[in-house]
Amino acid sequence: MSTTVTPLTTADAETLIAAARRATDEAGVPVSITVLDAGGHLLAFRRDERAVLISGETSTAKAYTALQLNAPTAEVADLVKPGGPFHSLPTGLNEPLLFIAGGVPVHRDGQLIGALGLGGGAPEQDHGFAQAALQAL
């Protein structure tokens, strides 16, 4: 028996962006926010004009990494450190992977439907903002 899960919609992506913005605005941290669909395609993006320029790239790479590994980037960062089981993974693939906290997968009914990434704050801040945004779905 096959069940169909509603994919991540533009409305969902806008909800995630708005929730992340509320969290970052309350903390006074300017960030970039990326939402990807299950295929890794950009669904929504928002960069605070005060955020560091590279945050747009880091938020997208964090979201992509969380999507590909179906895990928060905060949980996999230690795996690629020297001596970790996947130490060579970031350089062994031609993919925009970034093993820094701030990327989280998005699930619906237990199925992976996309990912959210934040960049611009400290890694633990970005992770907290992403987790807070997920609560809005």
Stretches found by the model and what they are:
Residues 1-137:
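Flexible, solvent-exposed loop/hinge segments and secondary-structure transition points
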